[in-house]
Amino acid sequence: MSDLELTVRPLRATVDTQAFSEALKNISLVLKKSDVPILEEASVRFSGGRCILTATDMTTWMIAEIPASGDDFSFIFSRTKKLELVCRRFDGSLTLEWTENTARHDGDGFVRLSCGSRTGEFDTWSTDLCPDIPKVDGDVSFSANAAELLERINRVAYATLK
C-alpha cells in the first residue's frame, strides 16, 4: 500500500433513549424558524459523564442535562425537529457515534444513532458555529424542576392570550 490510509475512529457515547428524547423535546420548544440556520438546531455536548443539550433563539436559552457514558465530544444536530421524531421510536440504550467528515475542512461531520437493530445517520455542524451562553451574575440563585415550572406556565398561559 503506497498511500497512507487514515482511519478515523468515531467518538462514541451512550445515553438512555427515553431521557434523551424527553430532553430533546423540552429544549426544542425554543427552536423557531430563523434567518440564522444554526439557531434552528440543538447543540449536544458530552463531557464528564453528562450529555448537555442546548437550544437558543438568542433571547431564551434552554439547557437539559442527562447522564451519559463514553467519550467527550460535541456537535450541532442538523434537522433537530426530525431527529426529535426519530428518537421517539427508539427504546432502551441509545448510542451516538460522531465522526468528523475529513473530506470537508469546516469541521462538519455526521452522527450515527443506534438503538438495538434500529440506526439512523444525521449530518452535524461544528459547535464553533454556535453562540456562547452568556454569563449571568445573579445575587440570588435557586433551583427549580423545569418540568414542573413549564407545567405551571402552561397552566396560566391563557391569561396572556389576547
Indicate residue ranges for each PLM-predicted region:
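Structural preference for solvent-exposed beta-strand-turn elements
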Residues: 1-162
